[in-house]
Amino acid sequence: MAVNLVLSFALAILISSSPTAVGVDATEELKEAVLTLDAGNFSEVVAKHPFIVVKFYAPWCGHCKQLAPEYEKAASILRKNELPVVLAKVDAYNERNKELKDKYGVYSYPTIKIMKNGGSDVRGYGGPREADGIVEYLKRQVGPASLKLESAEEAAHSVVDKGVILVGVFPEFAGMEYENFMVVAEKMRADYDFFHTSDASILPRGDQSVKGPIVRLFKPFDELFVDSEDFGKDALEKFIEVSGFPMVVTYDADPTNHKFLERYYSTPSSKAMLFVSFGDDRIESFKSQIHEAARKFSGNNISFLIGDVADADRVFQYFGLRESDVPLLFVIASTGKYLNPTMDPDQIIPWLKQYIVEYGNLTPYVKSEPIPKVNDQPVKVVVADNIDDIVFNSGKNVLLEFYAPWCGHCRKFALILEEIAVSLQDDQDIVIAKMDGTVNDIPTDFTVEGYPTIYFYSSSGNLLSYDGARTAEEIISFINENRGPKAGAAAAVDEKTQIDAVEEEVTSSSEPVKDEL
């Protein structure tokens, strides 16, 4: 069966089982450096602050736990400096706050949003995750959208090796070009730093004799700088988004790459991911070949990434990859997922060419737990590699639960599922089964947006989702109402129908026998 293709690496948080949080009284909100918000006080608090930063987190999230002390420290520094910036947090895993989670598009943890003008202007946070970096980033967000550069020293300090930087060069700070530059700077300031100058000679790269107006984009990758003279607002935004994105994204521990990774995994293009040890003697050859592949296949709607296996634990766990297969090239596309393990640098381009031209001849990769050697419990264990045998091709009526080990509702339902399985274990035409959706690819026949998700596949081939009460009585009733004929019964009926039809045809076509004596 085809599998769901996950093009966003940010894992969706599915069903909350946390206890309800206690609301924060508005008079008590200023006693802590980081304000605690929930559905009860969120709108009131956000509305009265011109600049508030909100962290959406989950109590169990490791990255949230790492960020928490840095976020608290940053809040304390900002308060002591009397900057008009407030830091707050929301437990987005709490069911009470689900509406806030959905409203602000929280699909991974932590997610940080900058809310200005009482919440009317909401933007993503694109800055560092340590206290000093958070403070400096937010200071820039409070100040002017673009800063004026007046010396080579200022330019060197602001531009060199500072990520993606935009500098507008203008003969005078007026006119349509300058105004549009400032509008775009205000709109995109959360993700990029903007500067302007009237003297291109102070800039560290590019033609220093230009008078402008031009926009020069500096970046620490690819061609290092790019110029544009198109000051239409839409054109300027597109120039920044395209030129400011690496030809090959790097997956490593560098926090400046986080925003590139988020965009990489959220775009609908196919993904080609090369994972290798950055300590490998051949690393420069691998980098050269993946960049050459990105140039060669730029028109094939493929986004490219190179990752250090030392920092890729989450990726490997999520996609079910093995470190023993490194160096590996992994492709995710609408047609499936494809893996080329233990490869050499000079195999990258030929294999990608084969994928593009002959992908139908490549065996798709499916993430699956091992098939259980023993599967004799009342609740059968289904994995990606045996779902066809147990569910689709068994000829039986199968109730299948998709669950996650961390899901509290799933743990409660496990007892009920066991009760159902024991009650029906003498019925040879019914199978009660479960599948861990976090470590197995789920066929596209199923829509799993939360855990637990329950489906029923009848012996006659009907697939139904179960949305009723999670009680043994209700589910058993649902199974009996929707079950198909017993295994072999349909075939027997078919065979008898065919025999009857043949007999009828023979009888009707035989000429009457005349008795002559």
Swiss-Prot record:
Glycosylated position list: N41, N301
Residue intervals of the Thioredoxin domain: 24-143, 357-484
Cellular location(s): Endoplasmic reticulum lumen
EC number: 5.3.4.1
Catalytic activity: Catalyzes the rearrangement of -S-S- bonds in proteins
Site annotation Lowers pKa of C-terminal Cys of second active site: residues: R470
PANTHER family according to UniProt: PROTEIN DISULFIDE ISOMERASE (PTHR18929), PROTEIN DISULFIDE ISOMERASE-LIKE 1-2 (PTHR18929:SF211)
NCBIfam families cross-referenced by the UniProt entry: ER_PDI_fam (TIGR01130), pdi_dom (TIGR01126)
UniProt-recorded name of the protein: Protein disulfide isomerase-like 1-2
Species in which this protein is naturally found: Oryza sativa subsp. japonica
